[in-house]
Swiss-Prot record:
This is Putative 23S rRNA (guanine-N(1)-)-methyltransferase. It comes from the Bacteria. Its EC number is 2.1.1.-. It comes from Micromonospora griseorubida. Belongs to the methyltransferase superfamily. RlmA family. Zn(2+) binds at C11, C14, C31, H35. Confers strong resistance to mycinamicin (MM) and tylosin (TY). May function as methyltransferase. Pfam families: Methyltransf_25, Zn_ribbon_RlmA. Keywords: Antibiotic resistance, Metal-binding, Methyltransferase, S-adenosyl-L-methionine, Transferase, Zinc.
């Protein structure tokens, strides 16, 4: 766990600060009340209390996602998110530099529902003054996220519940194709912080939906996202990003296997349908990046 993350973390049981247990290397985080949370050998800390009510992505889904993202297919989305995050972080310097606003250093970027941490890593590359925390309920995802970037850490938690973070401590919170917890996002964001939400548009993977029997994007998704956040945030702008992918049949299988359709598609039927596609398979990738300010 990166030491600069510790001031931001809180015990999920009692809410007190966490510190690394005395060991070399540290194998647990503890609070003054004695609650202890193991650090896995892969580097992530388990801050989940009890059993999560939501099932995280499986090891197979995470392996597919890592393979697909590593090929660069969604890099334009990561780049757009990184640019937005860099613009959202106020210019902050160490006390005594004479420029900007001297505050505690560095800033914290949190990815809620981080998956493998690839998008968080892109943001940290664009914001060199920040450290990052990947939150997810999937341990297979966090095994990768914990090593996604030298300035990143990772923690298992249920993002539908109380986040293991101090009040008003996050500079930028990013949320990519993941559940949104408006009250908690507002609690942990600084008053000058920013929430960046990436969701698929109706065009996303449209060429595959009918041919492969995939889940459709809800036409009312944008309205539902806005409604879920309206009590705690005000819109600060949005942009749409789309590009065309040229995929092999194997890459199409990987793409389907990494997302929610993997839970709802019969593998044998999917394989047969993909085998009937002509290569290269042209697929539209399209997302909306919405920016919000706390109110």
């Amino acid at each position: 766990m990166h030491p600069d993350l510790l001031p931001h973390l809180r015990c999920p049981v009692c809410g007190q600060p966490l510190h690394q247990a005395d060991a070399a290397p540290p194998r647990a985080l503890r609070c003054p009340a004695g609650h202890s949370f193991d650090i896995a050998r892969q580097g992530y800390v388990n801050l989940l209390t009890g059993r999560a009510p939501h099932v995280g992505d499986t090891a197979e889904m995470i392996a597919a996602r890592e393979e697909f993202l590593a090929a660069g297919h969604y890099d334009p989305f990561s780049a757009a998110l990184a640019t937005a995050a860099a613009r959202a972080v106020p210019r902050r310097v160490r006390p005594g530099d004479g420029v900007g606003e001297p505050v505690a250093y560095p800033d914290l970027v949190v990815d809620a529902g981080a998956g493998t941490g690839r998008h968080l890593a892109a943001v940290l590359d664009a914001v060199p003054t920040a450290v990052g925390l990947a939150l997810d309920v999937s341990k297979p995802a966090l095994r990768r996220a914990a090593r996604a970037h030298p300035r990143a850490g990772a923690a298992v938690c249920d993002t539908w519940g109380r986040l293991p973070l101090a009040d008003a401590t996050v500079a930028v919170l990013v949320n990519v194709f993941a559940p949104r917890n408006g009250p908690e996002f507002r609690r942990v964001l600084r008053p000058d912080g920013a929430l960046l939400v990436v969701t698929p548009t109706a065009e996303h993977l449209v060429e595959l939906v009918d041919r492969l029997g995939l889940l459709r994007v809800d036409p009312a998704k944008d309205a539902r996202v806005a409604d879920s956040l309206t009590r705690h945030f005000e819109p600060a702008g949005q942009s749409t990003h789309r590009h065309r992918l040229q995929l092999t049949r194997k890459e199409v299988l990987t793409l389907v296997g990494m997302g929610p359709s993997a839970w709802h598609t019969d593998p044998a039927r999917l394989t047969a349908r993909v085998a009937a596609l002509s290569e290269p398979v042209t697929v539209t990738a399209a997302v909306r990046l919405a920016r919000y300010r706390p109110i």
